């Protein structure tokens, strides 16, 4: 399995193929549409991420010591953003997730091309993923 940094570098490479942000937004939408279907049973208040303008549900499970994320959003670009985050961090250990520096967000210019509310939502998604990783780490050590 590739490291988080190797996966981030792949994302940076994929986005560097496009100069126009309309093309990059389309790539995000396409990524969201390619995502595995989200099980309706996980669309609960508990799985909703606070701080997002649109509704985003994030489900996490610990499988063989690795955190597996699934997500859904009612907004196409946001669904693409959460899919991108999942592509990079899902399938790694809690420690790997907690120790990661998600530099790809800056490198592809994502944060600066989002509205302030979407940018806050992005930060909320990352924070929630780290919270799940921390909870699983604590559970494994406990």
What is the role of each PLM region?
Residues 66-70, 79:
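Short small-residue beta-strand/loop micro-motif enriched in glycine and branched aliphatics
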Residues 73-75:
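A short interface-forming secondary-structure element
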Residues 82-92:
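Alpha-helical support elements that line or immediately flank enzyme active sites
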Residues 91-108:
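Glycine-rich phosphate/pyrophosphate-binding loops
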């Amino acid at each position: 399995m590739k490291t988080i940094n190797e996966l981030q570098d792949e994302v940076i490479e994929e986005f560097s193929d496009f100069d126009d942000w309309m093309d990059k937004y389309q790539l995000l939408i396409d990524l969201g549409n390619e995502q595995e279907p989200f099980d309706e049973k996980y669309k609960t208040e508990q799985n909703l991420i606070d701080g997002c303008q649109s509704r985003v549900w994030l489900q996490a499970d610990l499988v063989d010591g690795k955190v597996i994320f699934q997500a859904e959003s009612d907004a196409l670009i946001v669904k693409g953003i959460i899919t991108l985050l999942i592509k990079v961090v899902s399938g790694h250990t809690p420690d790997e997730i907690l120790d990661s520096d998600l530099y790809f967000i800056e490198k592809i210019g994502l944060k600066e091309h989002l509205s302030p509310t979407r940018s806050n939502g992005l930060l909320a998604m990352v924070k929630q993923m780290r919270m799940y990783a921390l909870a699983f780490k604590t559970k494994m050590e406990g």
